Amino acid sequence: MLAARNIHLVADSTRVKGAVPESGSEPFTLILSEDSFDSYKIDPPSNELTITKDQLVELYSEMVKMRRMEVAADQAYKNKLVRGFCHLAIGQEAVAVGMEQAIKPDDSLITAYRCHTFVVQRGGTISGMLAELFGREGGLSKGKGGSMHVYTPNFFGGNGIVGAQVPLGTGLAFAQKYLKTNHATFTLYGDGASNQGQV
């Protein structure tokens, strides 16, 4: 007999500490469910978040923009306007938007495919990303990188080889330490890459 998986949605258990102010710029505190973070041999982050209504609207607006870009890319791909692969991240917009809010502009980020939203959040433009998908010279990699091989000054690309971004990210982090910068490198990978030898 198969064991049933218990699924718990923590977003619906988020609550406000005190009252929500009328002003959009006045901060208030959200209390996240204690189940929001699982940790192993490390302290989890605080489950309290101080934010304003204006900031929440801005985050939501960015997520909607990222979704609309990915939907446009999907339509273009289905209409055969995009050559090669087109790896979308529809439904994962909050990851790119949330990370960009948490890290510094000079921090480095590297990932695998499904990187369009990270490219835009790290300084690329939606028009540049779409031009890249269409193979245009105005694309972020001059139309030669396609869906995966796109770069901005602190985004070191999606990577076409599953898990290959991990050793590259390690090298970026080592360079930051060697140069004594006050920056971090974030290397992102998914379930499939977690079983690769270099990870």
Model-derived segments and spans:
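N-terminal amphipathic, basic-rich helices that act as targeting or association modules
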Residues: 2-114
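Cofactor-binding active-site loop characterized by glycine-rich and histidine/acidic residues
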Residues: 71-75, 79-199
